[in-house]
A protein has these predicted regions:
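Calcium-binding loop positions in Ca2+-binding modules
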Residues: 137
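Right-hand nucleic-acid polymerase module
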Residues: 1-134, 144-264
């Protein structure tokens, strides 16, 4: 007996629908929903997608990286929007960091200066190396810190850019069409998440305690047969922007909030 990516259990040429659960997660203006197979004894209160089996360590690492990137994108979407600032901070030759320990110390000292003066601010920071220069730099997304204070409290080099997050973000879908995802900052989150290197060790990013967690709803039983061609109904006020069956055996759907739909 085998369960395919389409969710059907096949035995001796007969196909029947496997038991499935679905779960929605709300993060800012984005709602994601997964539909996944479970065994007949699965407790709906604690169910989650089965972790796939991997042929190699590389496959396992890729899967874990995708899960980590998805959680990071949800964190960004849950806490930041058009009032937030995205800043890139570089170090002058005088203060240049040469080791991971040095850039961590610089990041943490700057973090303390910001949080001391703006304790209610939301902050996420990552550090990385420039592709051409190999020099350390810091990226930050913040909400509740004036733009001039970011540069004033940095003082170790330049603020290359400090700009507000976009109200409209466009992504290319599977048909090559540009789709307005609104305040969905997954692309920015993936860019920042990709700065981490194995030599850095530890966590990929640092987030302030003021950041809120995405809201995960309890799982419910999927009583209908869903597919990317026949997705679950969008939450009120949301529009479907992405639908796909993953290589890991579950379906993934993304919806973004559209204020115009609330007027209907």
């Amino acid at each position: 007996m085998l369960a395919g990516a389409d969710g059907y259990v096949r035995q001796e040429g007969v196909a029947e629908m496997a038991k499935r659960h679905k779960r929605r997660i709300f993060a800012g203006a984005v709602c994601t929903q997964i539909v996944y197979n479970v065994n007949e004894q699965a407790d709906i209160k604690s169910s989650k997608p089965r972790k796939p089996r991997f042929a190699t360590q590389a496959e396992r690492d890729e899967f874990n990286s995708k899960i980590s990137a998805g959680k990071f994108a949800a964190l960004i979407n849950a806490n930041f929007g058009p009032t937030s600032l995205y800043s890139t901070l570089t170090l002058s030759a005088e203060f240049e960091a040469h080791t991971v320990e040095e850039i961590k110390r610089i990041r943490d000292n700057y973090w303390r200066r910001l949080t001391y003066r703006y304790p209610e601010a939301k902050i996420v920071m990552v550090y990385g190396r420039g592709k051409s220069t190999n020099r350390f730099h810091i990226h930050m997304i913040s909400d509740g810190i004036p733009e001039d204070a970011i540069a004033k409290l940095w003082g170790l080099g330049s603020v290359v850019e400090s700009k507000h997050l976009r109200k409209h973000n466009y992504y290319v879908n599977q048909n090559g069409e540009k789709v307005d995802h609104g305040q969905d900052y997954e692309a920015l989150a993936n860019y920042l998440h990709g700065h981490w290197q194995k030599e850095f060790g530890g966590h990929r990013y640092k987030a302030s305690r003021t950041c809120t967690k995405p809201e995960s709803e309890p799982a419910t039983e999927a009583v209908r047969e869903y597919s990317p061609e026949h997705p679950p109904v969008a939450p009120r006020g949301y529009v479907l922007v992405e639908a796909r069956a993953t290589q890991y055996g579950y379906q993934y759907y993304k919806y973004v909030f559209d204020p115009k739909r609330m007027k209907n």
